[in-house]
Amino acid sequence: MAQFFKAKPNSSKQLSAKVTLEVTKLDHLGAGMAQHQGKIVFIPGALPNEKVTVQLTEQKKRHARAKLLKIESDSNDRVEPKCPHYQQCGGCDLQHLSIDKQRSYKQSALVDLMAKLSHTEAESLAPALIGQEWDYRRRARLATHYNKESKQITLGFRASASKQVINIDVCPVLAKPLSDLIAPLSLLLNQLSGKKALGHLELIDADNGYFAVLRMTKALSDKDAKKLTAFANEKSISLIVQGNEGEFTILGDRNELPYYALDDVKLNFTPGNFIQVNAAINESMVKQAVDWLSVKPNERVLDLFCGVGNFSLPLAKSGAEVIGVEGVPEMVKQARENAADSGLDNVSFFHTDLSADLSKETWLGKVDKLLLDPARAGAFESLQWLKKMKPKAIVYVSCDPSSLARDSEPLLKHGYKLKKLGLIDMFPQTHHIEAMALFELD
């Protein structure tokens, strides 16, 4: 039998091709979507209702990716980005979209993802929790890179999908007093003899002042310590040096650790402890969670992934008995201290593996209501045993709607109804979507 040779398409020519496309919508990562030769093309930076010229950069069986080259006709929703480092820094990716449209896009993406992945709709869609669009971050970690040739430190954020550190001198989403510290700190760090030992820099806007936390892989020299101390006193900040083992030394006159308050509950935290970076949204989020759970003094509430007590302590203020569970021992210790400082004796904290079955733990007992605030990976393992506890109500705070949708399935199968769903706009100017869901046992 004769065999005929069929040449494969020239993929290099396909990828170098420039095409003009009509953008119809945004995907859940904020990239524009268009159609080309029967495939969906994802175009970062493009907006719906725009005609754009792009270069194809990746071809898959059912989709392609492209680089935005030129906007032939732009959307009425396109705005001028505020940050001079936008599209270089990998932090923000939606500054080119008006804030109102950012929020409506996120709301739609949340509802669509839940419907698509969990095959359910909420009985009630709550108003989005929103705050200021700029100057909202009370905490940020900046990376450092030492250049062996120039012998200089680059201080900034990493480029998108890259380890490259982009030099940053201002950050409009960071609280302005923290943003104003970046440039002088960059100058200071480059004056240190031990700058090669710099790991990262963390900036914190706490209720008791501003903090700069330097991660060092080697001990500071006396000369460098004096320079840092003088800077801390000049700027009236607390400067904390953190070593390899997590130990820290406070330099300067302000010898204290950071805290934030929720009403009359004070939450201390240390470098490395997780806290929500948007203070105003966190306050609204905690209030909404407490309202949705509607706890009563005779009820027992389980708070999984409790951290330093962000939800546990406000829940305990309602009079209910609260059990907080966390996988990081240092945060459990801090949560216990925070409860004691607030005079709350109706809350207990435990350290354990959150993926393990805790239903037989003697300290757990009956659970009337549940709050969980997991990391992006979600709480699928925990929900396998939690459903046996049959709490009457569950508030799930999610930083990844895909995980929330996946984790909803075992709850829905065991008689829970999705009563409420709401967007939490924790990170304006980015595509990141956070959400809160209320499940009740039918």
UniProtKB/Swiss-Prot annotation:
The active site is at residue 399. Residues 12-70 form the TRAM domain. Keywords: 4Fe-4S, Iron, Iron-sulfur, Metal-binding, Methyltransferase, rRNA processing, S-adenosyl-L-methionine, Transferase. One of its GO terms (molecular function) is 4 iron, 4 sulfur cluster binding. One of its GO terms (biological process) is rRNA base methylation. [4Fe-4S] cluster binds at residues 83, 89, 92, 171. It catalyses: uridine(1939) in 23S rRNA + S-adenosyl-L-methionine = 5-methyluridine(1939) in 23S rRNA + S-adenosyl-L-homocysteine + H(+). Its EC number is 2.1.1.190. The keyword Methyltransferase applies. It holds the Pfam family tRNA_U5-meth_tr. S-adenosyl-L-methionine binds at residues 276, 305, 310, 326, 353, 373. InterPro entries: 23S_rRNA_MeTrfase_RlmD, MeTrfase_TrmA_AS, MeTrfase_TrmA_CS, NA-bd_OB-fold, SAM-dependent_MTases_sf, TRAM_dom, U5_MeTrfase_fam. Catalyzes the formation of 5-methyl-uridine at position 1939 (m5U1939) in 23S rRNA. HAMAP family: 23SrRNA_methyltr_RlmD. NCBIfam families: PRK13168.1, rumA. Belongs to the class I-like SAM-binding methyltransferase superfamily. RNA M5U methyltransferase family. RlmD subfamily. This is 23S rRNA (uracil(1939)-C(5))-methyltransferase RlmD.
